[in-house]
Amino acid sequence: MNNINFNKFKNPITTADGSKRAFIEAKKIKTLWFNTGTLCNIECKNCYIESSPKNNRLVYLTFNEVKLFIDEAINKNLGTNEIGFTGGEPFMNKDILKMIEYSLSKNFKVLVLSNAMRPMLNIKEDLLKLNHQNLVIRVSIDHYQKEKHEEVRGKNTFDVMMKGLLWLNSNNFNYALATRLLWGEEEDQLRNNFNQFIDKYNLKLDAKSKQQLVTFVEMDKKVDTPEITTACWNIL
């Protein structure tokens, strides 16, 4: 931590050493993301937003707030084709079903990031009514082994997650998995092992697909992150 330059990323125009910062003008918003709130039913180690059953720093978004931005994306032709919902745990937000329904009604693809635990299972009958080819539930599973998954998410989380995952599978939802490269496995080996996990539970997935199994590279807070300058364009 002593070698980290905390003067970085403060000026939108220049880097810490005064160089011109590189940026690309946004031409469209392909995926419009909403954080539904920081509350979550569990508390994971190293959560990027420190979600927990007590953290309500980001209060719940309301349906009317989400509708406002979706309508703006449509009216301004922003090139949006997908609506994403993250948290916290999105299924804890009482308006999430209305948000999903409205997004689908406007012919958007919808991606919901969830731990597939009790908040989702508590509304499963209503969620079932929204099952649609354009809806994808991406389930967070930190490892295919129960012990490693619970090392991050806490005791008694794996079996409940599996109950939700198997419910999605048996009811023919479109779903995907998101995992982490946390234990030193090479990505190819991780995907092979996940395919064994998939076969074991008869899941309708292929771990070789980067859309069906998303892997996240671990970020080290102790490493100084470089800033990108216009000189980097010569590398491309």
Model-found features: residue ranges?
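Conserved alpha-helical substructure of the radical SAM core
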Residues: 2-87, 91-109
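Canonical radical SAM enzyme core domain
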Residues: 54-68, 88-133, 137, 141-160, ...
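Accessory recognition modules or surfaces
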Residues: 70-83, 121-136, 187-198, 203-210
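Radical SAM enzyme [4Fe-4S]-AdoMet core and its adjacent flexible, acidic
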Residues: 142, 146-236
